[in-house]
Amino acid sequence: MFKTPVSVLVVIHTPDLQVLLLERADHPGYWQSVTGSQNPDETLLQTAVREVAEETGLDATRYPLTALTNWNIQNRYEIFQEWRWRYAPGVTHNTEHVFGLMLSNPLAVTLAPKEHLQYVWLSWQAAAEKVFSSSNAEAIRKLALRNF
């Protein structure tokens, strides 16, 4: 089954703007926030909750309703050639929907070893510099402008 070319990006952060980053297992040195494709018959919010659980072991539903928010930001980008085999033939672009998950403080997370090698909590400035994706960097920079 092919992936749907719709995904979520979930920036996990604290009130003082520390940001959780994960290092990709399939590309060591590529750091990112939680990301993942939407499954059929799944809402974007359900996708965000599922991806956070799969990639960090955190249950986003255990936090206040205001902790996980849809930032109403969409990014359309070209799918890297090396990852296009995951999508139906002819699919070249993905639409990413940005969410934030605010935790009261940095937490230890449980990584999915096939997906990520390690994690780190960084200031928003350092996190924006470290991520490989420009849309991820932009979302982290926008974090500093949000009112919590």
Task: List the predicted regions and their residue ranges.
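A conserved beta-turn-beta hairpin within the catalytic core of GNAT-like acetyltransferases
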Residues: H27-G29
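A small-molecule sensor/coupling module
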Residues: A139-L143
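Conserved N-terminal beta-strand and adjoining loop/helix that marks the start
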Residues: M1-V19, P40
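A short gly/proline-enriched turn/hairpin at secondary-structure junctions
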Residues: Q32-T35
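Short, acidic/hydrophobic/Gly-rich beta-strand patch recurrent on exposed beta strands
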Residues: L21-R24
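Generic C-terminal helix-cap and adjacent flexible tail
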Residues: L145-F148
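Unchanged
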Residues: Q38-S134
